[in-house]
């Protein structure tokens, strides 16, 4: 039997997925079903672009529902209770400086499903996060990134 993948995430990330799932089930799914019903009333389905569009959206909505259900079923909520306060771990905001003298940057390391780099949330699967995880404030770390490597100093962990 194949081993199921776990989905590490913060409690906030899990709550957002649960909210999205509820919205998909209670709002989007009924809207799409209604669109399909209306499009069917137009007659010939072979050349009915409204029907095709609604069916495509239905496939997307049902696929996303299935994806979220799986992620929630195998969710592992990150608990930093047993991790030192100055250690980089998921769910924490990390401030680091690329050496020798770049401006400090801050990111929160989150599960893959919560990742949003433009909002300062990077996936625990990203090269940056993988390189930082487990290190402590004051450590200088060499991180392998797609176009080479970079050296950073960890300034703070919150």
Curated annotation (Swiss-Prot):
Give the start-end ranges of region Disordered. 102-125
What SUPFAM superfamilies does the record point to?
A: FKBP-like (SSF54534), GreA transcript cleavage protein, N-terminal domain (SSF46557)
> Which domain of life does this protein belong to?
Bacteria
**Keywords assigned by UniProt?**
Coiled coil, DNA-binding, Transcription, Transcription regulation
Entry's PROSITE patterns?
GREAB_1, GREAB_2
| Molecular function as annotated in GO | DNA binding; RNA polymerase binding
UniProt feature coiled coil, ranges: 49-69
**Cited InterPro entries:** GreA/GreB_C_sf, TF_GreA/GreB_CS, Tscrpt_elong_fac_GreA, Tscrpt_elong_fac_GreA/B, Tscrpt_elong_fac_GreA/B_C, Tscrpt_elong_fac_GreA/B_fam, Tscrpt_elong_fac_GreA/B_N, Tscrpt_elong_fac_GreA/B_N_sf
What GO terms in the biological process aspect are recorded for it? Answer: DNA-templated transcription elongation; regulation of DNA-templated transcription elongation
Q: Which Pfam families does its entry note?
A: GreA_GreB (PF01272), GreA_GreB_N (PF03449)
Q: Can you tell me which family this protein belongs to?
A: Belongs to the GreA/GreB family.
Task performed by this protein: Necessary for efficient RNA polymerase transcription elongation past template-encoded arresting sites. The arresting sites in DNA have the property of trapping a certain fraction of elongating RNA polymerases that pass through, resulting in locked ternary complexes. Cleavage of the nascent transcript by cleavage factors such as GreA or GreB allows the resumption of elongation from the new 3'terminus. GreA releases sequences of 2 to 3 nucleotides.
**Name of protein:** Transcription elongation factor GreA
Source organism per entry reads Limosilactobacillus fermentum (strain NBRC 3956 / LMG 18251)
What's the encoding gene here? greA
């Amino acid at each position: 039997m194949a081993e199921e993948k776990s989905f590490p995430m913060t409690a906030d990330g899990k709550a957002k997925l649960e909210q999205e799932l509820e919205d998909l089930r209670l709002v989007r799914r009924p809207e799409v079903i209604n669109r399909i019903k209306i499009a069917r009333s137009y007659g010939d389905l072979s050349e009915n672009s409204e029907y095709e569009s609604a069916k495509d959206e239905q496939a997307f909505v049902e696929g996303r529902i299935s994806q979220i259900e799986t992620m929630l079923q195998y969710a592992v909520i990150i608990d930093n209770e047993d991790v030192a306060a100055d250690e980089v771990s998921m769910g924490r905001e990390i401030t680091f400086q690329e050496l020798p003298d770049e401006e400090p940057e801050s990111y929160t390391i989150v599960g893959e499903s919560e990742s949003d780099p433009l909002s300062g949330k990077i996936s625990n699967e990203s090269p940056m996060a993988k390189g930082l995880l487990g290190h402590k404030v004051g450590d200088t770390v060499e991180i392998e990134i797609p176009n080479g490597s970079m050296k950073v100093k960890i300034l703070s962990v919150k």
